[in-house]
């Protein structure tokens, strides 16, 4: 039976950390991060003389970004499609290798200490993958085994999180292939929260969710920060979400940071420049700093390039 949906929050335990974490240690340090890709020009392959090599154009997705995120902060990346925000998340999560600069998670380098970093983080992405024939609960239990969570604790916590995210008891055993994309995204968020990571990487976590489901996810993110000292590093297309959740926001454009401040600080700055003192919105901020709409499509395509520093 799934009567555990009504468990009190204090009964839910968390994974033991791999190493003690100093309170004064920044959760995330990004120093001059660089990532380049080969640009796909969409042209047919041409014949070249033997021994000659066709030059491949490079594009910079992350252009020497520097960010420090203190422990316990919710830090947001706001940018149009192709601005580099998802690439930066993948660099932090060790899914991509930086071509330059340094990235450290609680002092651990993402290249030299990859396994330690992965024990401290969890990532939720809009393109999350699942075993579609399995239920929500079975997918979360599988993820828990990868993190060596005790079965009883994992089941208890999975049921608790799914309940808090608004999943009804009778749907816990339903195959994911029968669920909407929005419901599957909720399960992706639950999977990311399952191990109570000390650094939670959220790549557009509420994309595809209805307004009530968005609020459920946002409330749980705030609860994770409050109760488990979780640091959150997120990308979003949702201006209201960035304003509501984030302690600080970096606006990025073409792989570069064009502004970094609190939501109120950014709105004051743009409001003073535009004559909208006290009435500027995050949309005003974004348009003023980038000249783009968040719906503009500038996605970078191609193969990753690993070059020597």
Walk through the language-model features, giving the residues of each.
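Catalytic Walker B motif of ABC-type/P-loop ATPase nucleotide-binding domains
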Residues: 200-203
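Conserved catalytic motifs of ABC-family nucleotide-binding domains
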Residues: 196
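Helical segment within the ABC ATPase nucleotide-binding domain
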Residues: 215-228
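ABC ATPase "signature
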Residues: 260-261
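Conserved ABC ATPase "signature" region
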Residues: 33, 44-51, 122, 141, ...
């Amino acid at each position: 039976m799934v009567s555990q949906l009504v468990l009190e929050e204090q009964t839910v335990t968390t994974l033991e950390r791999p190493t003690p974490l100093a309170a004064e240690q920044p959760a995330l340090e990004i120093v001059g991060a660089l990532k380049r890709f080969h640009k796909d020009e969409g042209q047919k392959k041409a014949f070249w003389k033997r021994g000659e090599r066709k030059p491949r154009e490079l594009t910079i997705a992350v252009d020497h970004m520097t960010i420090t995120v203190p422990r316990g902060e919710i830090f947001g990346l706001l940018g149009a499609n192709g601005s580099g925000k998802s690439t930066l998340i993948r660099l932090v999560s060790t899914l991509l290798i930086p071509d330059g600069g340094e990235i450290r998670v609680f002092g651990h380098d993402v290249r030299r200490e990859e396994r330690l970093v992965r024990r401290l983080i969890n990532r939720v992405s809009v393109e999350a993958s699942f075993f579609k024939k399995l239920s929500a609960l079975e997918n979360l239990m599988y993820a828990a085994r990868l993190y060596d969570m005790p079965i009883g604790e994992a089941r208890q916590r999975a049921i608790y999180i799914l309940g808090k995210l608004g999943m009804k008891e009778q749907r816990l055993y339903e195959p994911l292939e029968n669920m909407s994309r929005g419901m599957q995204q909720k399960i992706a968020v639950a999977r990311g929260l399952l191990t109570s990571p000390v650094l939670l990487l959220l790549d557009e976590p509420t994309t595809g969710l209805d307004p009530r489901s968005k609020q459920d996810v946002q409330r749980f993110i705030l609860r994770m920060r409050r109760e488990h000292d979780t640091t959150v590093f997120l990308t979003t297309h949702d201006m209201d979400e960035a304003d509501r959740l984030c302690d600080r926001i970096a606006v990025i454009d073409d792989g570069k940071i064009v502004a970094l401040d609190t939501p109120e600080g950014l709105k004051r700055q743009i409001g003073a420049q535009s004559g909208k003192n006290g009435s500027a919105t995050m949309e005003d901020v974004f348009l003023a700093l980038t000249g783009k709409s968040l719906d503009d499509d500038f996605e970078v395509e191609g193969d990753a390039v690993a070059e020597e520093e």
